[in-house]
Design a protein with these regions (language model features):
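Short, solvent-exposed loop/helix junctions and linker helices
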Residues: 9, 91, 99-102, 160-164, ...
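Residues at alpha-helix boundaries and the short loops/turns that link adjacent helices
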Residues: 41, 65, 84, 194, ...
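NAD(P)-dependent short-chain dehydrogenase/reductase
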Residues: 132-147, 159, 169-241, 254-256, ...
Length: 344
């Protein structure tokens, strides 16, 4: 990309804020406007310390056409991170997911179409549903169709993933019908600094730091394909610079691990016994395995992740939560109380 102002939706959330920080650190000629509703998952503190001459925060809703129009008119590209994204919450009340993930995306792509600007849509591998465990597959997870690929059939299994699938399809349709200059990325599970403590890794880490016994859904055999949020940021920027309009790119770091292994790794790295946790009731419709095949992104665009050793990135993440207790402690009691209502 050439030097230009960009609009980042959801830029005060976990993944969006890490992208904004990456841009500020590594692309000094780019000005970033962040549009964020500042729901519970967004936090102005996620952008603290960033220079005011590089980053502007606008508090607003991506489904508000007037605000979106004003900001899109001043931007050369929109990078769309904003989303309702917690599966458990989508099972309790799907309506915010429909409004934000579908109607919000519609509002943004209409503005991008109006001003003929570049649009990148950040999505999830959960739109593809889930996969069998490696031991149950003929190629043990490495055969054809045993990982998600850009053309894998959509098969979402929750209100969250179905609304993300719907937003992906809107973007694809606007590319074909109206010539929208858009790309899509689907990524695996992110980890790193600034992630809300309701999510798996920060919940376990902050439980230990709060002298609360960690909790593990079901059997712990569910597999996630972990990618550090820094690598997600570099992947999105690479797609912005080199991606072909209308194409979908997958971002993953070959980080497949089951939840039990990750939890035991956290406990070990934090000086606890690997068995110092409780199994709790599983989530309804809990997807079994996610796995990304990022070959297309790596070979066509030359992207590669920095954090290829998961435990190195995990240790960095644990240290961040240890060093930034003031960022998460105030919300801890409330978050755990919500989980307790579901015996989780």
């Amino acid at each position: 990309m050439t030097s230009a102002p960009i609009l980042v939706t959801g830029g005060a959330g976990f993944i969006g804020a890490n992208f904004v920080r990456y841009v500020v650190d590594e692309h000094p000629d780019v000005f970033v406007t962040v549009l964020d509703k500042l729901t519970y998952a967004g936090n102005e503190a996620n952008l603290s310390g960033l220079p005011e001459d590089r980053v502007k925060l606008v508090v607003g809703d991506i489904a508000d056409a007037a605000i979106v129009d004003t900001l899109a008119k001043e931007a050369d590209a929109i990078i769309h991170y904003a989303a309702e994204s917690h599966n458990d919450n989508s099972l309790k009340d799907p309506s915010p997911f429909v409004i934000t993930n579908i109607m919000g995306t519609y509002t943004l792509i209409e503005a991008a179409r109006k001003y003929d600007i570049r649009f990148h849509h950040v999505s999830t591998d959960e739109v593809y549903g889930d996969l069998p465990l490696r031991e149950d597959l003929p190629g043990h997870g490495e055969g054809e169709g045993e990982k998600f690929m850009p053309m894998t059939r959509y098969n979402p299994s929750s209100p969250y993933s179905s609304t993300k699938a719907g937003s992906d399809l809107l973007v694809r349709a606007w590319v074909r019908s109206f010539g929208l200059k858009a790309t899509i990325s689907n990524t695996s599970n992110n980890y790193g600094p600034y992630q809300h403590i309701e999510k798996f890794i920060p919940r376990q880490v902050t439980n230990i730091l709060s002298d609360i016994k960690p909790k593990l859904y079901g059997s712990g055999k569910n597999v996630r394909d972990w990618i550090h949020t820094y690598d997600h940021a570099t992947g999105v920027w690479t797609i912005l610079e080199k991606g072909c309009i209308g194409e979908t790119y997958l971002l993953g770091a070959d980080g497949e691990l089951d939840n039990l292994t990750v939890l035991k790794m956290i406990l070990r790295d934090m000086g606890r016994s690997e068995d110092d946790f409780d199994f709790v009731q599983d989530r309804a419709g809990h997807d079994l395995r996610y796995a990304i095949d990022a070959t297309k992104t790596r070979e066509e665009l030359g992207w590669k992740p920095k954090y290829t050793d998961f435990e190195t990135g995990l240790k960095d993440t644990i240290k961040w939560y240890e060093d930034n207790r003031e960022w998460w402690q105030q919300e801890k009691v409330e978050v755990e109380a919500k989980y307790a209502q579901n015996n989780q």
